[in-house]
Amino acid sequence: MSWRALLYRRPSEPQAIEVFFERAVYLVRLRRHRQARRYTLRIDAASREVVLTMPPRGSVREARDFAQKHGGWIAARFKRLPEAAPFAHGIEVPLRGVAHRIVHRRGERGTVWTETDERGNRRLCVAGEPPHVDRRIADFLKREARRDLEAASRSYAGRLGVKITRISVRDQSSRWGSCSNSGVLSFSWRLILAPSFVLDYLAAHEVAHLVELNHSPRFWRLVTRLYPDARRAKVWLDRHGTDLHRYGLPERRGGADEV
């Protein structure tokens, strides 16, 4: 939580409240904002979290009444989210845009590897004990993402003659990539789930920011010069980007429990 949020939060104020609708209970995170003039609700599609923004002088009682009044809205939005796909045996996960079925092979050596059967079906195999399957798959995907993103970013940087200070790969929920004025590039590891042309476009986009830290026409010309098929990648992200956030989530829908 940021220091600004702590500044506006009252000492005894809860960080979240519960909203009941039909047979489900939803956990709603409270967030005060100094510029808020009214109570607002939103669903974070990436984290599957319900967030209620409050005015500085708003009360928890009013926030609870507001959220409960909109319980049907919350439930409807959750139903529209794609089903969670945990990293577990039998689940299909895309790797560079190609579906791979997770296969747990408890007795085998190694950690995670890919293979293709005689019918051309792709598998993402993981060894070890069942409790470690989720973490091992996640670690593997993050390593693959870093490898691809570093290779693509450094290739584009070489073409422009610019220097990357550092490359960070993490689970960013709000942006697929970013570039700081100090030359640090940050990316979401989930780009490894998308087709390779999407990852390549994001790498070109952020490297272009090392020259033009804006979204001016000159910036977009630079992106097109580095990656001529940028529009195709942008369209893919607009259509399918939200879906990438469902992988690796627990089977229970975020924020909702049956009562």
Q: Model-found features: residue ranges?
A:
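Walker B catalytic acidic pair
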Residues: 206
